[in-house]
Amino acid sequence: MNYPHPLIAREGWPFLAGAFVISLLVHASAGFWWALPLWIITVFVLQFFRDPPRPIPSAPNAVLAPADGRIVVVEKTMDPYANREALKISVFMNVFNVHSNRVSVDGAVEKVEYFPGKFVNADLDKASTENERNAVVIRRAADGQVVTLVQVAGLVARRILCYTKAGENLSRGQRYGFIRFGSRVDVYLPLDARPRVTIGEKVSASSTILAELDVK
């Protein structure tokens, strides 16, 4: 499988290097038991920033999960970024999930918008409208249908990273962003999309099918 990114995300390299060096210095100067809590933190940082390749389903009208986590919302509501009624599916990431964000559909980026905001628990519904967030509006290459991906910062996560811009073409499963330390991604779909997940279900980025789009 071709996944052109290191298995440990680059976003975590400074944190991992710092944790490792401090643990090593304390281990050398004070011994293993004093350093043990620091080694545990180092292992946690290592697992948090893991970024493994994932198989990508071939179904042409599938909308793939943009993140690892748990489904917390499946509802019809307004998509304020594309100004339409939409089906909204939200994925909550806890600190033990992979936090690399991946594209749900093939298409061209129409708009990228960043919104400053609060940092309430990303598991709460109000996080979608009150928290710091970054929206990417994508128009599918195949049929022009619009899918909006919104990275939402959480109580601990206060750093949204997005690596795409308007006019770029994206592919399903492509890595496009990262959120540090607990967060969520909201996905807004056409109203006639058929959800394939339920609230409470665990999903994997670019492997789990969130919904199927109606063929146009």
Swiss-Prot record:
Site (Cleavage (non-hydrolytic)): G182, S183
UniProt entry keywords in alphabetical sequence: Cell membrane, Decarboxylase, Lipid biosynthesis, Lipid metabolism, Lyase, Membrane, Phospholipid biosynthesis, Phospholipid metabolism, Pyruvate, Zymogen
EC number: 4.1.1.65
Cofactor mode of binding and number, as noted: Binds 1 pyruvoyl group covalently per subunit.
Post-translational modification: Is synthesized initially as an inactive proenzyme. Formation of the active enzyme involves a self-maturation process in which the active site pyruvoyl group is generated from an internal serine residue via an autocatalytic post-translational modification. Two non-identical subunits are generated from the proenzyme in this reaction, and the pyruvate is formed at the N-terminus of the alpha chain, which is derived from the carboxyl end of the proenzyme.
Residue(s) carrying Pyruvic acid (Ser): S183
Membrane topology, as annotated: Peripheral membrane protein
Gene Ontology molecular-function annotations: phosphatidylserine decarboxylase activity
Compartment(s) where it occurs, according to its Swiss-Prot or TrEMBL record: Cell membrane
Claim: Lipid metabolism is one of the keywords in the record: yes
Biological process according to GO: phosphatidylethanolamine biosynthetic process
One GO CC term on file: plasma membrane
Keyword Transcription part of the UniProt annotation: no
Highest taxon, organism lineage: Bacteria
Active-site residues from the entry: S183
Function: Catalyzes the formation of phosphatidylethanolamine (PtdEtn) from phosphatidylserine (PtdSer).
Family, as annotated: Belongs to the phosphatidylserine decarboxylase family. PSD-A subfamily.
Protein's name according to its UniProt entry: Phosphatidylserine decarboxylase proenzyme
Organism of origin: Cupriavidus taiwanensis (strain DSM 17343 / BCRC 17206 / CCUG 44338 / CIP 107171 / LMG 19424 / R1)
Gene encoding the protein: psd
